[in-house]
């Protein structure tokens, strides 16, 4: 079955921002089916709306599906996976600047992280799990991403100077995401 990647953006972003178009283009060139989802109302996001959007793709998910999320997209897919009834594990999830608790500077997003997450269900939902975090992220503290990686038993990839991996910080490509994905792909073909 063909590898499939869904890229989920974060708060105040869209499918045309940051490193998302680069990753999609790179994956398509490799013959991987790749889509960047446009999440509703990214300037004033509501969890229910984002879960409804993710649910539209639920029937397309399979063992060769990988979810790549950035920032607010991370708790959104974690909530999605908590409630999803999968017949088989997804191939994997990669969470860039991921978090699973309230951000002190963005409390208007607390709806996405209120209450505890079902870490075991999330672990069981995806064969491979990775968190990519920057030591100098001013939006999502590195410790939040590190905690998330521990909670969901994910590999943690530390970047020294990545900020929040935004376009205005110079990130129109993010090779580490591509490299982690392709390492997972190669594990599946052995």
Curated annotation (Swiss-Prot):
<dbReference type="InterPro" id="IPR010662">
    <property type="entry name" value="Hydrolase_RBBP9/YdeN"/>
</dbReference>
<feature type="active site" description="Charge relay system">
    <location>
        <position position="164"/>
    </location>
</feature>
<feature type="active site" description="Charge relay system">
    <location>
        <position position="137"/>
    </location>
</feature>
<feature type="active site" description="Charge relay system">
    <location>
        <position position="71"/>
    </location>
</feature>
<protein>
    <recommendedName>
        <fullName>Putative hydrolase YdeN</fullName>
        <ecNumber>3.-.-.-</ecNumber>
    </recommendedName>
</protein>
<keyword id="KW-0378">Hydrolase</keyword>
<comment type="similarity">
    <text>Belongs to the RBBP9 family.</text>
</comment>
<dbReference type="InterPro" id="IPR052581">
    <property type="entry name" value="RBBP9"/>
</dbReference>
<dbReference type="InterPro" id="IPR029058">
    <property type="entry name" value="AB_hydrolase_fold"/>
</dbReference>
<dbReference type="GO" id="GO:0016787">
    <property type="term" value="F:hydrolase activity"/>
</dbReference>
<dbReference type="Pfam" id="PF06821">
    <property type="entry name" value="Ser_hydrolase"/>
</dbReference>
């Amino acid at each position: 079955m063909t590898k499939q990647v869904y890229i989920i953006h974060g708060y105040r972003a869209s499918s045309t921002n940051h490193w998302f178009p680069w990753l999609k283009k790179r994956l398509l060139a490799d013959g991987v089916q790749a889509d960047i989802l446009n999440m509703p109302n990214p300037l004033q996001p509501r969890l229910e709306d984002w879960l409804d959007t993710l649910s539209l793709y639920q029937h397309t998910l399979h063992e060769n599906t990988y979810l790549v999320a950035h920032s607010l997209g991370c708790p959104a897919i974690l909530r999605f996976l908590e409630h999803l009834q999968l017949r088989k594990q997804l191939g994997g999830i990669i969470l860039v600047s991921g978090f699973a608790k309230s951000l002190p500077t963005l409390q208007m997003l607390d709806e996405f992280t209120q209450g505890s997450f079902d870490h075991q269900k999330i672990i069981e939902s995806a064969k491979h799990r990775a968190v990519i975090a920057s030591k100098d992220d001013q939006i999502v503290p590195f410790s939040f991403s590190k905690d998330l990686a521990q909670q969901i038993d994910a590999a943690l990839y530390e970047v020294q100077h990545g900020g929040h991996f935004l376009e205005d910080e110079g990130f129109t490509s993010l090779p580490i995401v591509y490299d982690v994905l392709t390492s997972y792909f190669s594990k599946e073909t052995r």
